[in-house]
Amino acid sequence: MKMFKSLSLIPRIVSPFQKCYSTDLINLVGVPRVKITKGQNRYLLVNIHTHGFTKYGRVIVRGADVDNHLAIFDSILEELEPEGICAKILGGGRILNEPDNKKIKIYGTSRTFGGADHTRTRNILQAWTTYKDFKITVKQ
C-alpha cells in the first residue's frame, strides 16, 4: 500500500518539468529555419537553443541587406530573447538571392564572426520549401 501512495506522487513531481521542457521546445521549433531577403545580402549561420540545453539546438539562417553582420545578430537577439532562446553564431558570409531566376549564390566570410560552413547553409536552404527548386551554388 505504501508503494502505491509513493507512486501517486510521481505525476506531481514530473508535471512541472514536463511543462518546462515542452514549452521551451515549442518555442524552439516555432522559429523559422530560414529568413533571407531578395538581392545581395549578408547572412549568418546561427545555432539556437533554449537556455541551459545547448545539446538540443537547431541551426538557422538569417540574412538581410545591412551594413554589417552585427546588425543581423542584433535583430536575431531581439527576435529570440523574449522567447527564452539563446543564439550562438557559427559564422557568416554573403548570399545573392535571385528569386526570379531561382538561383542563390553563397560566398564570402564575415569579418566579425568568421566564415560559415556554406555547404551546411546550402543544405538548410534546400530543405526549406521556398528554396527547394532553386539552383544553389557555393563558393568557398
Curated annotation (Swiss-Prot):
<dbReference type="Pfam" id="PF05005">
    <property type="entry name" value="Ocnus"/>
</dbReference>
<feature type="binding site">
    <location>
        <position position="42"/>
    </location>
    <ligand>
        <name>substrate</name>
    </ligand>
</feature>
<dbReference type="GO" id="GO:0101006">
    <property type="term" value="F:protein histidine phosphatase activity"/>
</dbReference>
<dbReference type="GO" id="GO:0007548">
    <property type="term" value="P:sex differentiation"/>
</dbReference>
<comment type="function">
    <text>JanA and janB regulate somatic sex differentiation.</text>
</comment>
<dbReference type="InterPro" id="IPR038596">
    <property type="entry name" value="Janus_sf"/>
</dbReference>
<protein>
    <recommendedName>
        <fullName>Sex-regulated protein janus-B</fullName>
    </recommendedName>
</protein>
<dbReference type="GO" id="GO:0030154">
    <property type="term" value="P:cell differentiation"/>
</dbReference>
<comment type="similarity">
    <text>Belongs to the janus family.</text>
</comment>
<dbReference type="GO" id="GO:0005829">
    <property type="term" value="C:cytosol"/>
</dbReference>
<dbReference type="InterPro" id="IPR007702">
    <property type="entry name" value="Janus"/>
</dbReference>
<feature type="active site" description="Proton acceptor">
    <location>
        <position position="69"/>
    </location>
</feature>
<keyword id="KW-0221">Differentiation</keyword>
<keyword id="KW-0726">Sexual differentiation</keyword>
<feature type="binding site">
    <location>
        <begin position="110"/>
        <end position="112"/>
    </location>
    <ligand>
        <name>substrate</name>
    </ligand>
</feature>
